């Protein structure tokens, strides 16, 4: 039976993959993965599977999210086991909701396999308990960026001294973050920790406080910022110690990346997005027509995702 799996790759260490994720990767026919999935995790994929990089690097996308959605629907008609592999957990800032909606519209069977999200990996690396009955009774997972890349800090009204804040994808917005947190009433000496490439060999950790966020530059991506009284410095202080971390190392990692480039099949660039979108609409109409035909409560005898490539520019030849 054809099936799509939305799999969380975790922070990058293959030992942190779930047993179920390892099993599915080992049986995959095709894997559509994000740019941040590490080579070590990709090595867990079956040798017979196709690897397609559909991620983005430094804001440059191979495919838009709409094109990825349509491509996912397309390959679901061609392969038995399709894996959409996402860094961290698919359901936390992984755009899984849009892909779930696209698959549901055309009746594709899918399953979600959770992964360890970056906030948990970063907290473990920095030895920070995100909750502590003495200091923090709630945790807020958020991001500094909106859809389209613009900076958004409209969540700061929810910050209290009893809140641990985990900021995904802070990018270069540390100065804005520091200023906004101070204006929201947070103590300037509230400790912070930034973890870059959490759970990977190139992992870097640095401590500062809210007042010191404005000084941060050249930090490698991916990074995660944790703010709150639960944060403890490894040197027993929350004083800014960034000079001890040799920021030039972070800058070098930002250039080389936290992962080595892989030799992928560059075919994701060759597909016509209009073809994917037309295919998705066609399959959606077929699925709705089939459901009307069989009536409520009856299961369709044939899978609605029967290969349609002959109607769309001989997609099997293009895919091969």
Tell me what each language-model feature is.
Residues 34, 54, 113, 142-144, ...:
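Generic beta-sheet signal
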Residues 99-100, 104-127, 131-140:
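Catalytic cores of RNA-modifying enzymes
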Residues 2-4, 77-82, 95, 138, ...:
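A contiguous loop/helix-start segment that scaffolds small-molecule binding in enzyme catalytic cores
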Residues 270-320:
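Short, positively charged, Ser/Thr-rich terminal linear motifs in low-complexity/disordered regions
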Residues 60-67, 121-123, 145, 150-151, ...:
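Short, charged, surface-exposed secondary-structure boundary motifs
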Residues 1-14, 19-116, 212, 220, ...:
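Class I S-adenosyl-L-methionine
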Residues 49-56, 107-111, 130-137, 185-194:
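Short hydrophobic/aromatic-enriched beta-strand-loop microsegments
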Residues 40-41, 120-121, 176-177:
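Phosphate- and divalent-cation-binding pockets in alpha/beta enzyme and binding domains
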């Amino acid at each position: 039976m054809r099936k799509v799996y939305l799999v969380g790759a975790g922070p990058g260490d293959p030992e942190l993959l779930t047993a179920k994720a390892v099993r599915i990767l080992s049986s995959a026919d095709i894997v559509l993965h994000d740019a941040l999935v590490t080579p070590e995790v990709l090595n867990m994929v079956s040798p017979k599977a196709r690897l397609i990089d559909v991620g983005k690097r430094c804001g440059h996308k191979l495919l838009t999210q709409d094109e990825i959605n349509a491509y996912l629907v397309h390959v679901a008609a061609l392969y038995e086991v399709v894996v959409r592999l996402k860094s961290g957990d698919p359901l936390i800032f992984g755009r899984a909701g849009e892909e779930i909606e696209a698959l549901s519209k055309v009746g594709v069977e899918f399953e979600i396999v959770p992964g360890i999200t970056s906030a948990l990996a970063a907290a473990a690396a920095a030895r920070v308990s995100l909750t502590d009955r003495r200091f923090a009774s709630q945790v807020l997972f958020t991001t500094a960026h909106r859809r389209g890349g613009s900076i958004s800090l409209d969540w700061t009204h929810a910050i209290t001294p009893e809140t641990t804040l985990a900021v995904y994808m802070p990018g270069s917005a540390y100065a804005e973050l520091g200023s906004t947190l101070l204006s929201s009433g947070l103590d300037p000496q509230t400790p912070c920790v930034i973890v870059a490439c959490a759970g990977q060999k190139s992992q870097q950790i640095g401590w500062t406080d809210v007042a010191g966020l404005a000084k941060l530059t050249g930090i490698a991506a991916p990074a995660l910022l944790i703010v709150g009284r639960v944060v403890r410095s490894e040197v027993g202080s929350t004083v800014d110690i960034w000079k001890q971390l040799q920021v030039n190392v972070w800058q070098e990692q930002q250039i080389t990346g936290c992962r080595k480039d892989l030799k992928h099949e560059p075919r994701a660039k060759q597909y016509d997005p209009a073809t994917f979108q037309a295919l998705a609409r066609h399959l959606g109409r077929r699925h709705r027509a089939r459901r009307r035909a069989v009536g409520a409560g009856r299961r369709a005898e044939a899978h609605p995702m029967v290969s349609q490539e002959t109607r769309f520019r001989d997609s099997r030849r293009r895919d091969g």
